[in-house]
Swiss-Prot record:
PROSITE patterns hit by this protein: ATPASE_E1_E2
Residues in the Extracellular compartment per record: 85-96, 268-276, 666-670, 731-764, 819-826
Record family assignment: Belongs to the cation transport ATPase (P-type) (TC 3.A.3) family. Type IIIA subfamily.
Organism listed in the record: Arabidopsis thaliana
A GO cellular component entry from the record: membrane
The organism's place on the tree of life at top rank: Eukaryota
Name of the molecule in the record: ATPase 7, plasma membrane-type
Active site: D332
Membrane topology designation: Multi-pass membrane protein
Enzyme class: translocase
EC numbers: 7.1.2.1
């Protein structure tokens, strides 16, 4: 039997690879522990396929038609059926042109939605490809990082802490693993997997490191077989609920208008059947914001692409709106606020064991480090050697214990040149100290050294050593000796202080969450200007803390927490959410996953584990806090575009329904349905550009405020409807425009209205005039709703302006020159066209003040702050007490010499000025320190601080005067 034929037997699952001995697994899979060659991989990919589940292929036709299947489209489809099925009689031909127009409008919206979503889907697929799970496998005799989708049965893979198991596999020699199988079996606790056991695709490694041989991939895995049994659930997010609420409001408004028209037309006016149908069609076609789902989804998709360009990949689209409302960010210190580029000052190493010097301590620490797949600490330690190979020179490695959150240390068991067994371990000082046989004797000195390091912003790394006389690799060995404490320095990022200040001005409170000591956290907070109001994780356990306040208040007011474990992160997020905060949380490890899932916005930082990425909403591809704050601003801009459009959509619904209903009720004026279609089509073309509009993000956290959206929309829409009625009255009932502008007189009292031909002629001209008035001011409204302050001072996007000008040029030409009997309009000439533009300009001038009045009524803000535009004129919500935070931050920055007074960070030159001030403050401090060191007092104090002596304590016996 050839190798291929033998492997084909595996695909039929006639061999139980989960239960046969591991040696037989290699025989059946025709592989060795040296892995596969590239040719073997290609053959197996052809046979087994890629390591991914089968994707359901969606029909493009059904997907296209799906954009016509929503409540707003149903109303338009009902209008189309009315036009073709009910609009007959009354001495008029069948309403085919209206039917065709409605279908064209539906097709235009569906086409735009289909194309944009397809483009967004392709872009999203490309972005998500960056997040595709990776796996370390032996190929052609070398370890390589490959896409997990390229794994095949027979591959040798490495599994370590934080990895999501990429395929079903059997474990080889090594230490037991702790595997979280909750996603597969529902087991809440991790299970122990010994060498030889099976691990399944989709589970997570919680502890340990080992090699394994892949036995099944793709649809043949345990997860793949169960996937088809799981029904996908439809989750209705907050964004969808908002869309539904706005859509329902518009539909209800139309229903009310139609009910009034039915009662008046058929009950009071006793008019014909066809007249009523045409008037109802006007409300149905013009009132429905048919483009709303398209505009909002396209806006969000384009926004997600921009976020990705800034280094923040959005896994869940609705996370954008939550990011816009985030008011508290719980940030890791290491790698986010700091560079995560550790260095060790050899001169400061404190040695505790006789016979060991600092060079030997460094060598021992390097032995307890990995030479490959190093973390930041391992890199810092090994880089201190002249040659990294020195770490293993003259010894034989027997067993390496990798770091895990449970023991917080690494260890190496090895044989020296004489064949004696030794073990060396490095890790968290408390863990190392607990192992020492003489911990009670050295405890005070160790803690004093740790505190001395912490006061200088240095982390401590403990180092211990033991002999293993019995020669048992897994035995306990002899007593542990505490060898040394190594100081680790992780410098803050150059932009962290400025970014934190920027966040405070944006209403986002940044809290430092770190596993380091409290003194280190406070020193880092002081350097970054974020405050030193920090607490140990023990203060989270009960309300009996030294501050005498509840834990909730403590968390809300704290600048950060030190000595934090992953479970503390979860508790912090939970309590902040209970205080009505929208909370973001950064994380990178497997144990951060619960907190990332719990947070409103889980943010996996650069180089996070697969488990952390899987639990997050946003994945960063660049390090640092500035990426997050930039993403916040971008999210607010995206959210602002969506909110601007929803206000516009509600306004247009009200102005169409109310305006044409009043004309019908009081003047029996019948506006042609086809011209409403023209308005809708031109509006759609213009409004689509709002997804790329230039907007000013909210200076404070923002969220959906339906009360504001509906109130602003109703008032603005009602105003425009009333102005349409005023225009109609002035043109149809008076000589006002004729006398002032010397244009053709449309006053009905100057015509023989009993003559049907004359009346029809006048009505067609009035329809053309009303069409231009409604079209122009309706589209101009978007410039009002898109701006936070005066619309003429916030420059709109180029595409929006061009689209508006083209649409209104078309509308003006139609009104001035078009004679369309089928559409019920007749040309009014360029004179009347100019008059209507002047009327609409005057109408437009009152829109901004009305917008301010509505927001003033909703928020209660003073007039000065209202028109200033910097507070968004929206209902004020206590987003983490932003005034208190901003005042506190200013005070702290002033104390540190970083700022001389109030200066908003969003001024154009503020970034440069802040950098200059920071450099100047740093230079002044350095000059003062150097001068002080030249004095006897300065030298004594400097030496005392270095030794850990307290000169302020008169009872101290560490020195004499």
């Amino acid at each position: 039997m050839t190798d291929i034929e033998a492997l084909k037997a595996i695909t039929t699952e006639s061999i139980d690879l989960e239960n046969v001995p591991v040696e037989e697994v290699f025989q059946h899979l025709k592989c060795t522990k040296e892995g596969l060659t590239s040719n073997e991989v290609q053959e197996r990919l052809t046979l087994f396929g890629y390591n991914k589940l089968e994707e359901k292929k969606e029909s493009k036709i059904l997907k296209f038609l799906g954009f016509m299947w929503n409540p707003l489209s149903w109303v338009m489809e009902a209008a189309a059926l009315m036009a073709i099925g009910l609009a007959h009689g009354g001495g008029k031909p069948a309403d085919y042109h209206d039917f065709v127009g409605i279908v064209v409008l539906l097709l235009i919206n569906s086409t735009i939605s289909f194309v944009e979503e397809n483009n967004a889907g392709n872009a999203a697929a490309a972005l998500m490809a960056q997040l595709a799970p990776k796996a370390k496998a032996v190929r052609d005799g070398k370890w390589n990082e490959i896409d997990a989708a390229e794994l095949v049965p027979g591959d040798i893979v490495s599994i370590k802490l934080g990895d999501i198991i990429p395929a079903d596999a059997r474990l080889l020699e090594g230490d037991p693993l702790k595997i979280d199988q909750a996603t597969l079996t529902g087991e809440s606790l991790p299970v122990t997997k010994n060498p030889g056991a099976s691990v399944y695709s989709g589970s997570t490694c919680k502890q340990g490191e080992i090699e394994a041989v892949v036995i099944a991939t793709g649809v043949h895995t345990f997860f793949g077989k169960a996937a088809h049994l799981v029904d996908s659930t439809t989750h209705v997010g907050h964004f969808q609920k908002v869309l539904t609420a706005i859509g329902n409001f518009c539909i209800c408004s139309i229903a009310v208008g139609m009910a009034i028209e039915i009662v008046v037309i058929y009950g009071l006016q006793k008019r014909g059947y066809r007249v009523g149908i045409d008037n109802l069609l006007v409300l149905l076609i013009g009132g429905i914001p048919i483009a709303m789902p398209t505009v909002l989804s396209v806006t969000m998709a384009i926004g997600a692409h921009r976020l990705a360009q800034q280094g923040a990949i959005t896994k869940r689209m609705t996370a954008i709106e939550e990011m816009a409302g985030m008011d508290v960010l719980c940030s890791d210190k290491t790698g986010t606020l700091t560079l995560n580029k550790l260095s060790v000052d050899k001169n400061l190493i404190e040695v505790f064991k006789r016979g060991i010097d600092r060079d030997m301590a460094v060598l021992m620490a390097a032995r307890a480090a990995r030479l490959e797949n190093q973390d930041a600490i391992d890199t810092a330690i090994v880089s201190m050697l002249s040659d990294p190979k020195e770490a293993r020179a003259g010894i034989k490695e027997l067993h390496f214990l990798p770091f895990s959150p449970a023991n917080r240390r690494t260890a190496l068991t090895y044989l020296d040149g004489e064949g004696k067994m030794h073990r060396v371990s490095k890790g968290a000082p408390e863990e190392i100290l607990d192992m020492a046989h003489n911990k009670l004797e050295i405890k005070e000195k160790v803690h004093a050294t740790i505190d001395k390091f912490a006061e200088r912003g240095l982390r401590s790394l403990g180092l211990a050593y033991q002999e293993v006389p019995d020669g048992d690799v897994k035995g306990e060995g002899g007593p542990w000796d505490f060898v040394a404490l190594l100081p680790l320095f992780d410098p803050p990022r150059h932009d962290s202080a400025q970014t934190i200040e920027r966040a405070l001005h944006l209403g986002v409170s940044v809290k430092m969450i770190t596993g380091d000591q409290l003194a280190i956290a406070k020193e880092t907070g002081r350097r970054l200007g974020m405050g030193t109001n920090m607490y140990p994780s023990s203060s989270l356990l009960s309300d009996n803390n030294t501050e005498g306040v509840s834990v909730d208040e403590l968390i809300e007011n704290a600048d950060g927490f030190a000595g934090v474990f992953p479970e503390h992160k979860y508790e912090i997020v939970k309590r902040l959410q209970s205080r009505k905060h929208i909370c973001g949380m950064t994380g990178d490890g497997v144990n951060d996953a619960p907190a990332l899932k719990k947070a409103d916005i889980g943010i996996a930082v650069d180089d996070a584990t697969d488990a952390a990425r899987g639990a997050s909403d946003i994945v960063l591809t660049e390090p640092g806090l500035s990426v997050i704050i930039s993403a916040v601003l971008t999210s607010r801009a995206i959210f602002q575009r969506m909110k601007n459009y929803t206000i516009y959509a509600v306004s247009i619904t009200i102005r169409i329904v109310m305006g044409f209903m009043l004309l019908c009720v009081f003047w029996e004026f019948d506006f042609p349905p086809f011209m409403v279609l023209v308005i809708a089509i031109l509006n759609d073309g213009t409004i689509m550009t709002i997804s790329k509009d230039r907007v000013k993000p909210s200076p404070t956290p923002d969220c959906w405020k339906l009360k504001e959206i509906f109130a602003t929309g109703v008032v603005l829409g009602a105003y425009l409807a009333i102005m349409t009625v005023v225009f109609f009255w002035a043109a149809y009932e008076t000589n006002f425009f004729h006398n002032i502008f010397h244009v053709r007189n449309f006053n009905q009292h100057h015509f023989k209205m009993k003559d049907k031909k004359v009346a029809a002629h006048l009505n067609e001209q009035m329809a053309s005039a009303v069409y231009l008035q409604v079209s122009t001011i309706s589209q101009a409204l978007i410039f009002v709703t898109r701006s936070r302050s005066w619309s003429f001072v916030e420059r709109p996007g180029f595409l929006l302006v061009i689209a508006f000008l083209i649409a209104q040029l078309v509308a003006s030409v139609i009104s001035a020159m078009a004679n369309w009997p089928f559409a019920g309009i007749r040309s009014i000439g360029w004179g009347w066209t100019g008059v209507i533009w002047i009327f609409n300009i005057v109408t437009y001038m009152l829109l901004d003040p009305i917008k301010f009045l509505v927001r003033y009524a909703l928020s209660g803000k003073s007039w000065d702050r209202m028109v200033e535009g910097r507070t968004a004129l929206t209902g004020k919500k206590n987003f983490g007490q932003e005034e208190r935070m901003a005042a506190w931050a200013t005070e702290k920055r002033t104390q540190h010499g970083l700022e001389t007074g109030q200066k908003p960070v969003y001024e154009r030159n503020s970034a440069t000025e802040l950098n200059n001030m920071a450099e100047e403050a740093k230079r002044r401090a350095e000059i003062a320190r150097m001068r002080e060191l030249q004095t006897l007092k300065g030298k004594v104090e400097s030496a005392a601080k270095l030794k850990g002596y307290d000169l302020e304590d008169p009872n101290s016996n560490n020195y004499t005067i």
